[in-house]
Amino acid sequence: MNENIAEKFRADGVARPNWSAVFAVAFCVACLITVEFLPVSLLTPMAQDLGISEGIAGQSVTVTAFVAMFSSLFITQIIQATDRRYIVILFAVLLTASCLMVSFANSFTLLLLGRACLGLALGGFWAMSASLTMRLVPARTVPKALSVIFGAVSIALVIAAPLGSFLGGIIGWRNVFNAAAVMGVLCVIWVVKSLPSLPGEPSHQKQNMFSLLQRPGVMAGMIAIFMSFAGQFAFFTYIRPVYMNLAGFDVDGLTLVLLSFGIASFVGTSFSSYVLKRSVKLALAGAPLLLALSALTLIVWGSDKTVAAVIAIIWGLAFALVPVGWSTWITRSLADQAEKAGSIQVAVIQLANTCGAAVGGYALDNFGLLSPLALSGCLMLLTALVVAAKVRITPMS
């Protein structure tokens, strides 16, 4: 019965892709991600200006992720049948307001309030991203549209920290957030002009969010999502100490490694649609398997700089398939409840990021330099096995 509902949902979809709207969504996502990570490169001047420690100032990033987790879980319950066009506009307005609140903050409390506004927009937008995409393009074009959106994410992740640091040294951290507010205004304008009316879920289709986990293969999928992102953050959060102490990179060398990783991630995202068109399941199982082998390679031969640098590139290419692949899985296998599935997915990812970084840090402190790599490799291998054995992928109609 669920398959029939999904087929009907696809049949009622759009006939021609609305690429202007897709790029508007991608631009909004890029702006949200950029603003999320701006404080990482501006912590010192922010802390000095507000009279707080850098550790306290760093909580401006934590509060955004924390609010985003709850926003993603409850946003679909709150907005119900509201036209999604207005909701996306609201998120763009919240992005702009967040930047202005941070820019004019004269206290830590106002700073956190501004960053909480960003978390509301970030979590809500991510929860709706898959369902928005599948309503803007035909089913056959969804992987390509998702690769555009996640390509924007890759670009934002690459440029956010260095751009913030560069501009902060020239115009000051407050004006960096003022410039980000201008980007928010551009988001509002672009969304207003390009995004069509997207009515909310009819009342007869409403279903408890967590009842989706009872569908065959869905719980396994969410477990696989958790393990893959936890595995990523268990290692990548500590890539600096691992690469500097294991492979002997200096700061400049590490910068080049991270830049190579970012470029590889962008390339992987850009070409992900071609892989996913052939087999979503192969991509979702193959990518973590390749990452598990990469972790093993680093453990055995990571002291060689060339090997370590190549593995960073392979890691960026392979992991790029993971977020696009799981969003594609939602649009294929949970098409009739894509918003609610997206809400659970984003919450799972946020929790996985937190747990992966925390456990990876504990392992690094207590079991040595290679332990985050070993933890990451084990989680990636388990992900591949769960996907191969338990996750179901609905064929594209």
From Swiss-Prot:
It comes from the Bacteria. It is found in: Cell inner membrane. InterPro entries: MFS (IPR011701), MFS_dom (IPR020846), MFS_Efflux_Transporters (IPR050189), MFS_NepI (IPR023680), MFS_trans_sf (IPR036259). The chain crosses the membrane at residues 22-42, 55-75, 86-106, 108-128, 148-168, 176-196, 216-236, 256-276, 282-302, 306-326, 344-364, 367-387. Residues 1-21, 76-85, 129-147, 197-215, 277-281, 327-343, 388-397 are cytoplasmic. It is a multi-pass membrane protein. PROSITE patterns: MFS. Belongs to the major facilitator superfamily. DHA1 family. NepI (TC 2.A.1.2.26) subfamily. HAMAP family: MFS_NepI (MF_01189). Involved in the efflux of purine ribonucleosides, such as inosine and guanosine. PANTHER family: PURINE EFFLUX PUMP PBUE, PURINE RIBONUCLEOSIDE EFFLUX PUMP NEPI. This is Purine ribonucleoside efflux pump NepI. The lineage of its organism: Bacteria, Pseudomonadati, Pseudomonadota, Gammaproteobacteria, Enterobacterales.
